[in-house]
Amino acid sequence: MRLQSDTAFLGALTNVPSGTYTVQVSLSNPEIVFLNDTGSTITANGKMCAAGAVCSVTLTAAGTPTISSFTLTATANSQQGIELDFKLKNAISLTSGALSVNFNPASPNPGVFTAFTLPRTNANLGTNQLELIEDFTGVVSLSGSTVTITSPTRGTLIAKSTSNSFFDHSPDGAICPTTSTITCVKAGQIASVDAFVKSDGTLEVKEFEPLNATQKDFVEGIVYGVSSTTQQFTMAVTDKVQAATNSLIGGLNTGDLLTVNIALAPNPFFVDSKGLSVQSSSSYSFFAGQTSASAIHPGQTVAVNVTTFVAATSTTLAAVTSDTVTLRWSRFTAAAVAPFTTQLLNVNTLPSYFFLTPASQFVVQLYPGTAGGQGITNFDGITDGSGIVPNPVSVRALFLENTGITANPAFFAAKVRQH
């Protein structure tokens, strides 16, 4: 889900001999979480997935596809960046009710990977910037102006803070208040970082946002079911951070399905605004300050602090109790619908796990301004919202909705990628 709108950093290579190279990718044992919206039961690696169910399966597919359409010519003392585009749709097939994955489908089927050099056209980056890595979440350590974020699910990101780096306040407003500097960054915080990939392969902090003051059990996921009568919802786990000691969630993995029980007296819900002026919208209160599961909707991404944990069994999902629920960033691909302006984008045909009528249109709030500025929507492939064309767009946005599904706007975009 993350790579629909965002980019992951795979690393930097040094001392590459001069020559011409192809790119080969090694993949194995993919875990896939999906909503079976086909109307019939699906079988995946021997596991049955009923119609209308959300299922998590690990497949045995493996492969080392070579991206034949791309070659890299390395010369002495040159610095180059390469980006890979992974098209999961081209790897998945459904035949006679059986779901399978092939990372190297035979011609004339479309390839799973394409590659290109960086920076991309209309990437809206500055001098010596190749790409922007966004929302890398983990535990903070600090050495001078160098910030390290360690994630149990995504590895480690090391980036240098500069005078151009932004520091957003935490969702509860207690950490890094307005006009903060790196002095508000403390070891042991849970934080989200955006970082520029520089032409020399190093990373520079664009934006730092603390999420928790201390390292504790913290789980993020995509909501797919809500029961407001029982103060309960279900989600697919997309990220986690474990407490420094005595973690309850060591056996919980990304891709697992999880039941979340809201505590009897929870903290008022928070919204991770990431510097966007979301608070000024009437939609903000649909989530912020609430304490009931009725404020939560399928398709939202939320983070929860874990106070109790019960492991999964063969018949029941793993379950946690949480006293703190924070709205974070939904990532999805949808159809862009005209008209397009610098401030508003209309979309329909959202993914089926939102459980919304495909033809229904929803308004996405955009935040125009100087590219790379604080509180501004990042655009990839277009200069601003007025350049959007009626093709699919991938969006990372806050989803703020009411019980009648009439919020306008319903989405507040930190990122828009034009396809």
Predicted features by range, described:
Residues A244:
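Short acidic/His/Gly/Ser-rich catalytic and metal-binding motifs that mark active-site loops
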Residues Q232-M235, V325-I382:
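Intrinsically disordered, low-complexity segments enriched in Gly and acidic/Ser/Thr residues
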Residues G251-L252, A359:
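Eukaryotic compositionally biased low-complexity/IDR segments
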Residues G255:
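Single-stranded RNA-binding regions, centering on S1/OB-family and related RNA-binding modules
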Residues Q365-G369, T377, G385-A410:
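C-terminal interaction modules of eukaryotic adaptor/scaffold proteins
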Residues M1-Q231, A236-V241, G250, L258-V260, ...:
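A short, solvent-exposed, low-complexity linear motif enriched for acidic/polar residues
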